[in-house]
Amino acid sequence: MAGLSGRTVRDLRRESRGAVLQRLYFDGPMSRRALVPATGLSSGSVSNVVAELLADGLVEEAGSVGSEAGRPRRLLRIRPGSGCLVGVDVGETRVRVELFDLGLRELARAERPLGPRGYDVDAVVGHVHEGVAEVLGAGARAAGELLGVGIGVPGIIERTEGQGAVVHGQTIGWDAVPLERLLRRPGTGQLPPGLPPEVPYFIDNGAKSLGQAEMWFGAGRGARNAVVVLFGSGVGACVVTEEAAQGRAVEWGHLTVRVGGRRCRCGARGCLEAYAGAEALVARWREAGGRPSDGADEETALTELLAAARPADGRASDPVAAAVLAETAEYLGAGLSDLINLFQPERLLIGGWAGLQLGGAFLDRVREHALAQAMRFPAGRVGIELGLLGPDAVTVGAAVLPLAAFFARGGHRPRPATRPAPSPAWRAALDGRLV
């Protein structure tokens, strides 16, 4: 029965279960008594919900703690083995697939290089299918335990009624790619063989996935407003505010920093990414006379640039490499100052493989430029730091997508998709006559 708000008893029950699960997940182990103020539920509701979750195998007891009355209170926590999650990072050089338990402990991983076909859609779909099957086998987890597959991809994600998540990835040559539909077997709407049909895909922007991971488990935890920057071959950002708790991806890398400037991968000129992305950074070093090793990939070339600019053995710095890094710090600082002025975050975090590889010394110079160019008030209250989760942050963030949906369902497993009932024979006959 629905109340005035339109919510049914089942809805309220699901929300109560979700509230208890989330508090135990982020703040557990906790006692039943501590859950009452933490969730805003009555003690009776907490007791009933906990009893259900224990019976479902989602929660387990984890010792006890003393109380003023002398009787110990039993502590509760999420049972990590009660389900598993897959996170996928469709990155710039490879597709990385990781299997996690509910506590986000890594159980297995698989990687597939993108190779000469690059972002060929069929190749990427095949890599995801193979990777999911591989990690489930390596982690010795049954497909029925899987709560969902989260995928972080470059580009703008459009949610559509008929095809699910559609990816608009201009810089990688994806124009309205119906990725969610392609990940399922054509014509059936089912997942690849071996996975139950009810296992859902959750597809989102890679920078947003990175941001979600840092906000839940990394350097952004506890902040109400933050911007998390992904610095790899290209650059992107995720903006998290109190009004948009899940965060939203912004195409920050395609902010124009020089009118009529360098050609960007997106086709425009003068984008920030054309100056500050790792691909552009290495290209500018080559143009200035730098010499990365023959056949070096992007990550290796960036490592060599850093070694030339900041030699570890006491040799003199290569002035060409040092000048390219200094100019890049200035461009990135200008881009960050725009984010500070626009969104006025408490924290501005830099992640992505290139951002982490460039490290703290480079960040100091970027921070100096950003704070010098931003408005004084927002600049005075923002902290600019490196992210904490390392190169796996996108896969962790992608796995958070099915985890968040699991909480929203109150800990219930995904249900099989309902198929429409077949049309009666008279309808088929009538349709045939009307053609």
Residue spans for each PLM region:
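ATP-binding/phosphotransfer module of carbohydrate and carboxylate kinases, centering on a glycine-rich
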Residues: 1-64, 68-72, 77-113, 117-137, ...
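Short glycine-rich anion-binding loops that position phosphate/pyrophosphate groups of nucleotides
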Residues: 65, 154-157, 232-234, 354-355
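Short, ordered coil/turn segments that flank beta-strands lining enzyme active or ligand-binding pockets
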Residues: 81, 102-103, 160-162, 241-242
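Short, acidic Gly/Pro/Ser/Thr-rich loop/turn segments
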Residues: 93-95, 156-158, 236
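Glycine-rich phosphate-binding loop and adjoining helix at the ATP-binding site
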Residues: 106, 111-225, 251, 361-372
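Active-site glycine-centered loops adjacent to acidic/histidine catalytic or metal-binding residues
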Residues: 206, 232, 398
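AAA+ ATPase active-site-proximal loops
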Residues: 208, 235, 350
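Glycine-rich phosphate-binding loop of actin/hexokinase-like ATP-binding domains
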Residues: 219-276
